[in-house]
């Protein structure tokens, strides 16, 4: 009986295993579409919602073609999306992050990338790619750097010893 009840919860996506109507929110105005670029990260933050770390590769990197497919769907569905945002893990560990951002910018979306601004972002190929994108798309590209506190001791408590100095 327990197995049957468990399987029933997957029978109808709108009904819970107890027969109650499942809560839902209709997607009608997605102004910003968020992508998780993968679960790998160069640090381990205690507050990370997805438990990203240097070893957590549970979520594979999203590819440029997958993002392009979603961009096509935005157009097909006539959504009012104006911004594409990326989080992770650390987005700049995804080897395709610059190309992914370029595809979004080429289709006239604003792009927001959340980063810890540490070693992955300091790679020459990433810096070169970002400079090219900034030169061409300037104000359409926003890089938001995670800084948890203006004092190193509190930031480091969240993100690891020494992370404040590296970020700054």
Question: Whereabouts are the PLM-identified features?
Answer:
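Conserved alpha-helical substructure of the radical SAM core
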Residues: 3, 7-88, 92-110, 120-123
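Conserved AdoMet/S-adenosylmethionine-binding subsite of the radical SAM
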Residues: 94-168
């Amino acid at each position: 009986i327990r197995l049957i009840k468990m399987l029933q919860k997957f029978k109808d996506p709108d009904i819970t295993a107890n027969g109650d109507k499942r809560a839902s929110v209709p997607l009608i105005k997605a102004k910003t579409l968020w992508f998780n670029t993968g679960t790998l990260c160069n640090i381990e933050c205690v507050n990370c919602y997805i438990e990203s770390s240097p070893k957590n590769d549970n979520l594979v990197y999203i590819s440029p073609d997958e993002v392009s497919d979603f961009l096509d769907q935005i157009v097909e569905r006539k959504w009012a999306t104006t911004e594409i945002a990326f989080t992770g893990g650390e987005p700049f560990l995804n080897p395709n992050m610059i190309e992914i951002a370029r595809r979004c910018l080429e289709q006239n979306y604003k792009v927001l990338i959340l980063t810890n601004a540490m070693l992955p972002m300091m790679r020459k190929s990433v810096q070169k790619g970002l400079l090219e994108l900034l030169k061409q798309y300037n104000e359409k590209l926003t890089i938001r750097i995670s800084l948890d506190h203006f004092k190193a001791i509190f930031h480091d408590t969240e993100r690891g010893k020494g992370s404040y100095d590296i970020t700054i």
